[in-house]
Amino acid sequence: MITRRALLAGAAALPAARAWAQGAPGIAQRLDDAPAAGIKRDLLIQWGDRVAYDAPPFAALAPNLAAAEGQFGWDTRVLAAMASPRVEDGIPRAVLAVGHPTLDPAMAFPDGRDRPEIAGAMQGASLINIQRRGGVWLVTEGGFQMRRLHARTLCRMGGAGGPARGVFGITGGAATPWGSLLLTEGEGAAWARRLPGVEAAQTGHVVELDPFEPQSVPVKRAALGRFGARDVAAALAADGRAVVFMADGRDGGLLWRFVSDGPAAEPNALDQGTLYAARFEAGALRWIALPADADPYGAAVARGANSLGRPVALALDPNGARLCLALREFPRNPAGAVVEILFAARDPAGDTAIVENLMEGRVPPRPRPGREPALVPAWPVAPSSLCLDGQGNLLVGTAQPARDSALPDALYALPLEGRARGEPSLAYITPLGAALGGVAVVPGAATWVAGVAHPGAGMGAQFAAPRSRWPHFRDGEPPRGGVVALSRGG
């Protein structure tokens, strides 16, 4: 069996892990919106803020379809941060991709009554121009790449397919080495049931678009399978073909891979290729090729593909050395885990890989009734979003199913090498009731951007009576999820 040392031998050494976030031995159970020492938090954008240049001001008490289609969506999942084309003024800029997977009517609408058409406008995805001025990252008002994708966005099906309506339930995404953006409709099936007139067969896809051209038509790449992938990551094979990894977040979900027939540089490279499913066995992984005309899941299971748990998030080393995978319901551990997949010969299109546990979640002790909130170990529970920071750390965001957990959701940094490998450092604690909704690294900057998803949520919470009114804490104003920038120097 190939050893980990042999697999990486001869490769350029990865940067040593840097303790960018400050470690913490424990945190109080009810800490709320707290960056670690030395980290500055700035709010970038929030639910209802303008994305389209002509969107009206946010009016939470009067939800409106036309307004919602031009405003930042209700739910938040940071997907990718891409360097903007360089200009001569030297101002750091980036394009931020954010998904809006779901919408809870009780928290989004004043009377708690669902308004499916407006809800369909509040979900989907947003592309945001950001820039750094005066040491602070800001949204660029009227930025060229700013756009909203929602239930009425015109799309097309890949291959010989025709037009398609809408982008639905975006739970994951990734920038590709060939310059496009991939989005996953992980909650697409739920929106197909919720919205009238939506064809179920046109949901649940991986969607590809040009993030730098606001008029580009999103394409649903049917060749990658239709199973509502939870997340996606993209790489180049050693021979230049496109490689796309997909995490199927269903119970018993599999890890998938698509390898294009032709070079990734071809405009429709993702329309022709081979779909694979992973078989895990004794610290190793083997890819199983699937026939093009079969049901992918049935064919995969029949050929021996298996699951380590529920795959929910991916992070890919751009140098091709490793893929990190977050799992829910890891065997014998309900708190989940993160595993590291090391490609043979550093080729993501290779047939085999080594699999190693990087970190397992820990379930915190329950608080005792009537007692003051105690300190509990600052350790990830239910890892749900991943990002490699380029400095030797894996960023891990948590999203626990129960909103009354003893431990708040948070962002952690895990070194990948050295003596501290797999030991988490706490970077940011989300507001009360919120989950950590994805994380990305701004290219060329010592800044992370993280999503704050559904703040104020919890048992019995509603629009008029949330658990928190983050971020402004104004009477009568609902909590508003959004994106924060986390930078050194706070």
Q: What do the PLM-derived regions correspond to, one by one?
A:
Residues L14-G490:
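Conserved small-residue
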